[in-house]
Amino acid sequence: MGDMTNSDFYSKNQRNESSHGGEFGCSMEELRSLMELRGTEAVVKIKETYGDTESICRRLKTSPVEGLPGTAPDLEKRKQIFGQNFIPPKKPKTFLQLVWEALQDVTLIILEIAAIISLGLSFYHPPGESNEGCATAQGGAEDEGEAEAGWIEGAAILLSVICVVLVTAFNDWSKEKQFRGLQSRIEQEQKFTVVRAGQVVQIPVAEIVVGDIAQIKYGDLLPADGLFIQGNDLKIDESSLTGESDQVRKSVDKDPMLLSGTHVMEGSGRMVVTAVGVNSQTGIIFTLLGAGGEEEEKKDKKGVKKGDGLQLPAADGAAPANAAGSANASLVNGKMQDGSADSSQSKAKQQDGAAAMEMQPLKSAEGGDADDKKKANMHKKEKSVLQGKLTKLAVQIGKAGLVMSAITVIILVLYFTVDTFVVNKKPWLTECTPVYVQYFVKFFIIGVTVLVVAVPEGLPLAVTISLAYSVKKMMKDNNLVRHLDACETMGNATAICSDKTGTLTTNRMTVVQAYVGDVHYKEIPDPSSINAKTLELLVNAIAINSAYTTKILPPEKEGALPRQVGNKTECGLLGFVLDLRQDYEPVRSQMPEEKLYKVYTFNSVRKSMSTVIKMPDESFRMYSKGASEIVLKKCCKILSGAGEPRVFRPRDRDEMVKKVIEPMACDGLRTICVAYRDFPSSPEPDWDNENDILNELTCICVVGIEDPVRPEVPEAIRKCQRAGITVRMVTGDNINTARAIAIKCGIIHPGEDFLCLEGKEFNRRIRNEKGEIEQERIDKIWPKLRVLARSSPTDKHTLVKGIIDSTHTEQRQVVAVTGDGTNDGPALKKADVGFAMGIAGTDVAKEASDIILTDDNFSSIVKAVMWGRNVYDSISKFLQFQLTVNVVAVIVAFTGACITQDSPLKAVQMLWVNLIMDTFASLALATEPPTETLLLRKPYGRNKPLISRTMMKNILGHAVYQLTLIFTLLFVGEKMFQIDSGRNAPLHSPPSEHYTIIFNTFVMMQLFNEINARKIHGERNVFDGIFRNPIFCTIVLGTFAIQIVIVQFGGKPFSCSPLQLDQWMWCIFIGLGELVWGQVIATIPTSRLKFLKEAGRLTQKEEIPEEELNEDVEEIDHAERELRRGQILWFRGLNRIQTQIRVVKAFRSSLYEGLEKPESRTSIHNFMAHPEFRIEDSQPHIPLIDDTDLEEDAALKQNSSPPSSLNKNNSAIDSGINLTTDTSKSATSSSPGSPIHSLETSL
C-alpha cells in the first residue's frame, strides 16, 4: 500500500498508461465512466482495466492508509485536472430581471394599459371635439391647462406603477442577497472527514479532491463518488439515485461503488474519491436537469410561465410568500405570477425543481435528487398554518375587491349612458366617440383603483419581510432556519418532543461509576485495585471495539477539558481507560483497523457493537459492548475479583440489576456492559449466524456514564411551560435514567399526575389486538405522557403523529421535535417544526429538519418560540392595519363613484395610499423586535383564526370612525371649510381643495391608526416600546413628510390643491382623533360583541384539496421536466419518477394501515433502524415490522382505498407527511447541505 509510485506496477500496466497524457494514471473521463457502472459489472471493469482498487489508488498517487500528502500544489493540480467538488450555483437574478418580474403583476398590467389608453386619448384631438353635443357631456369648455390634465393623470399612474415595481424589485433583490449569504454560511458549515498525510482531518465538502481517502460512517451523506477500499458492514441507501429502496451492502469484491448523494445507513469504512462536483453521479444528473440553467430560463419565459404555474405548489406548500401567491396576481384571476411574489421564491421554484439546481458545493448535490427534494419540501407539512389562513383570507378579500370594482365600473358606465343618452337625449355622434371613450377609460381607471386598494398585495410582502427579518435575527440566537415558514409555525407550538442526549444534556460523556471484579465502585477505581488480567481485557475491549475514528485529544486551551472526537459514548469509555492510567493507542496500533477480522456494527436490532479479532494462536476473540440490560442477558459468565470467569446465572443477573444497574440509573447514569467471548480456531464459527455468535459472553464490567444536564435547560423548560408549551422527553435510555434526568430538567415535578413509559409499554397501550395503532388509544396517553424511554425512532414518529392528528383537545396541537440521529428523520419530517442539532446531528437529520440549532442547545428553541410568536403578531398587526384601510378605501371609492360619478380618492392617490399601507406599513409593523412578554401567553394553536374578535372590533371600530368623517367631509366639507365643492366635477377639471382635504385626512387617519395597529391584544399603551423600533418611527415620519410634499406640490399629477395651515391642522386633528378613538374601542369589552365574527380560520377539511392538487400537479411537473431532458438518464429518471409517484400514493393511505408482509424494506425503515452507536439510542426498537416497513407496499395495494378513519380530516397532512416519511429516503437524500434549497423554496 505504502509506495504510491510503484515502479513494477507501472511497467506492468504500461499499455494502460500510454493513453493518458496527464500526470495521473487515469483520466477524469475514465473515472467518470467507471463510476457509472454498478455491482459485478464494475468489479469486472476494475479487474480488467486497473487490477484492483489499490492500483487505482496508486494511479491517483494516493495511499489508502496515509491519504494524500495534502500539499497546496498537489491539491491545486487535482482540482485543475479532475475538477472541484462544487456545482456552480445558478447566477442570481439581476435587478432588471426582478423589475421585469414585478411588472408581471396582473393589477399593475391593467393599470398600465388604462394609463396608456388615457395618455393616448389625451393627445388625440378629433375634429368634432368642439361639437356642442360632446361639450355638454364633457361638462363645459376646458381651458388650456385643464386639457393637459388628461395626460398628466396617465403619466402619474405610470410613474406610481414604476415606483411600486422598483420597491418590489428592491425588496426581492435584498432578500435574495440575504439568502445567498445564508447559503454560503450553510455551505461553510458542512465538513467531511478525510485522511491527509496520515492525519484524520475534517475539511469543508467543497475542498474534497479526487484521490482523497474519505472516512465514512453511519449517518453520512456521501459528498463525492468513490471506491470502497476497506470497512465494516457498510450498507448504503441508494434510493436517491436509483429509486430502489433496499439498502445495498458494499464490499471490495462485490460492489465497491459509492455514489455521491447516497446515505450511509450502517457501518463505517474508507473510500478513495474518484469523481467530484459536476463529474460525480449526482453532479451529472444536476447538469442534465439544469441543462446549464439557461434553457430552463428561456423555457420559463415562454407562454404563461407554465413552469411557474405548475411549480408554485412545489415551491413548498409552506412558503409564506407564495401563500398569498403574488397576492394580486394570484388573487385576481388565480393565475400565479412571479410578479410580486418573492423573486427568491420563483428563483427557488426554478432551481429547486428538477430544473437548474442551485447547487451548493456538492453537498447540495449530495442531495441526490432535486425532484425528490422538491417533493419533500412540497409535502413537508400541511401548508404552514399561517400561510393557509393567509391564502384563504387573501382570496376572499380579492374576490370581494373584484366584485366591488366590477360593480363600480358597471354603475358608472350605466349612470353616464343613461344620463347622457336617455335623460339628456344626446345622440351618439361619431366625432364624440373619443370623448366618450375617455369617460369610459376614466371609469375603468376608477374601477381598477378600487381593485388595487382592495387586493392586499402587501400580505405576502409583510409575511416575507417579517420572516426574512426574523430569520436574520434568529441566526444570532443560534437558530439556522432552513424552511422559512417553520419560524412562524414555531410561534404556535403547543408541544416539544425533545431528545435527551446533547439537547437537554451536554453530550460530554464521562464514566463516573463502575462494577468490576465483583465490586461496585462509586467513583473511578484505582487501577491497582483491579486484577491485572481483568484490566488488560477491559482496555483491549474498549480500545478495539470502538470506532477507530473516536479519540480523546488533548485540550485546545490550557486548563480546558480534553476534546472528545467521534461517538460520545465511546469517548466516555476511552476516557475511562485514560482515567485508569492506561493508554488505548498502543493497543490500536498493534491491532490496526485493517486487521479486524469481523465487525458487527451497532444497529437498532443488535443494540450492541462487537468486534472479532484473530489471536496469535489462530483462535478468535470477540469483544462486545452495549446497553447493560441487553448485553447482560447474553452473558453466561462474569469475571471475578481474581480475574477468573465464574458462572453468571439469571438470578445473579436479577440481583445485579437490582443492586448495581438500577441505582446507577436512578442517579441519571447510562449503563454500558463490556464483555468478551473466545472461539476456537477450528472449526471456524459461522460468523453470519449472529444469534449463536453474540451469545454465551463473559461480562468484564458494567460502567455508569454521566451526561450532565445543561445548566440553562431547567430555566428554558420553565419558560416553555409558562408559555403553555408542554415539553416531553423522548430518549433511548432506560426509564430510571430518563426519569432522573427529567426531574433534574424540570420536565416532571414529583407529585404531579404524569406518565413515564418505556417504548414497549407505550406500544402495548396504543395498539389493538391486531397490532394496529388506534388514535383513540393514543389520545388516552399523550396528554399525560412526559417521558418516553427506551423508545425507537418508530415510537418517536408514532407519538409525534399521534399528537398532531389528535382532535382530542379543542385546540389542535402543533408539535416541534428535536433530533440528531439518522433515525430521527421521520419524526423530524412529520413534526410541524423539526429541529436538528448543528453539532451532534447527522447530515440526514439536518436535511429532514426545518431549523438547525447551531449550538445544540434547548434554550435556543425557546428563542425560536419567541420569534415565531413575534412573526405571527407582526402579521396580525399588519392585517389589522391593512384591512381597516381596505374597507374604508373601497367603500369610499365605491360609494363616492356611485353617488358623485367620481371617486373622491383618485387613481394616483390610491396608488400612494396603497404604497404606504402595503409596502411601508408592512416594513414598519413586520420588524417589531420580540419581547419576553410574548412568552407569557398561551400558544394560538392550529385552528385559531388569523383575525381575532378583538382585532375585528378594532378594524370595524376604526373603519366606522374613518368612514363617518370622510363622508361628512365629502357631503358637507365644502360648507365647513367654505370652499368650492369638488363633487360632479367635469372630466378634466383642476384639482379641488375639497377633495384634497378628504385625501389628506384619509392619509392622516391611516398614519395615526398605524400606531394603534402596533397592539392587537387590546393593550392600552400603544406607544409602549415604539422607540425600540427605529424602522417604525422612520417610516411614520417619512410618510408624513412625503404627504406634505404631495399635497403642497403634487398639483395635477396627484390631483391635489395646496392647503392652508388651518386646513392642515384640521386634517391632523382628525387624524389624532384615531388615537383617542382607539382608547374608546379598547374600553368596549370584546365579549359583549357577540355578533363579531372571526376571520381567517382554517378548518381541517380545507387543508386537503390544496395539498392533493399539489401532488398531482407536482407529478405532472416532474414528468414533464424529466422527460424533456437529455436521454442519457432516461431510465434512471423514469425509475425515480415512478418511485416518487408510487411513494406519494403509498403514503397517501394512512401511515399505520395494512400490515401485510413487506415485500421490500423501504429505506425509511432502515433509516429508522440504525442509530449511531450511541447508547441513548440503544433502543429496544420493536422489530420494525410494524408500520413503516409496510407502508410502501401495503399502500400500493390499496392506494385506491380511502385513508383510515382517524385521518379523515387530515389526509392532507398525511399525504404530505407520510410522503415525507418516505422521503426521508428521498428528501433526506436530497441535498442535505442545501438547506437553502428548502429555504428559498419556502420563501
UniProtKB/Swiss-Prot annotation:
Entry superkingdom: Eukaryota
Gene Ontology BP terms: auditory receptor cell stereocilium organization; calcium ion transport; cell morphogenesis; cerebellar granule cell differentiation; cerebellar Purkinje cell differentiation; cerebellar Purkinje cell layer morphogenesis; cerebellum development; cGMP metabolic process
Swiss-Prot/TrEMBL keywords: ATP-binding, Calcium, Calcium transport, Calmodulin-binding, Cell membrane, Ion transport, Magnesium, Membrane, Metal-binding, Nucleotide-binding, Phosphoprotein, Synapse, Translocase, Transmembrane, Transmembrane helix, Transport
UniProt modified residues of type Phosphoserine: 18, 27, 1178, 1201, 1211
Broadest EC class assigned to this enzyme: translocase
Active site: 499
GO molecular function term, any single one: calmodulin binding
Compartments it resides in: Cell membrane; Synapse; Apical cell membrane; Basolateral cell membrane
Location of the region described as Calmodulin-binding subdomain A in the Swiss-Prot/TrEMBL record: 1123-1140
Keyword Cell membrane: yes
Record GO cellular component, one term: plasma membrane
Binding residues for Mg(2+): 820, 824
Biased composition (Basic and acidic residues): 296-308
Cytoplasmic topological segments: 1-94, 174-390, 462-875, 927-946, 1010-1028, 1083-1243
Catalyses which reaction(s): Ca(2+)(in) + ATP + H2O = Ca(2+)(out) + ADP + phosphate + H(+)
InterPro entries: ATP_Ca_trans_C (IPR022141), ATPase_P-typ_cation-transptr_C (IPR006068), ATPase_P-typ_cation-transptr_N (IPR004014), ATPase_P-typ_cyto_dom_N (IPR023299), ATPase_P-typ_P_site (IPR018303), ATPase_P-typ_TM_dom_sf (IPR023298), ATPase_P-typ_transduc_dom_A_sf (IPR008250), HAD-like_sf (IPR036412)
Composition bias, Low complexity: 313-330, 337-356, 1196-1211, 1220-1234
Residue positions, PTM Phosphothreonine: 1139, 1188
EC code(s) of this entry: 7.2.2.10
Region of interest (Disordered), ranges: 1-24, 296-382, 1194-1243
Short name of any one Pfam family annotated for the protein: Cation_ATPase
Family that this chain belongs to: Belongs to the cation transport ATPase (P-type) (TC 3.A.3) family. Type IIB subfamily.
Subunit structure: Interacts with PDZD11.
Described function: ATP-driven Ca(2+) ion pump involved in the maintenance of basal intracellular Ca(2+) levels in specialized cells of cerebellar circuit and vestibular and cochlear systems. Uses ATP as an energy source to transport cytosolic Ca(2+) ions across the plasma membrane to the extracellular compartment. Has fast activation and Ca(2+) clearance rate suited to control fast neuronal Ca(2+) dynamics. At parallel fiber to Purkinje neuron synapse, mediates presynaptic Ca(2+) efflux in response to climbing fiber-induced Ca(2+) rise.
Name this protein carries in UniProt: Plasma membrane calcium-transporting ATPase 2
Natural source organism: Rattus norvegicus (Rat)
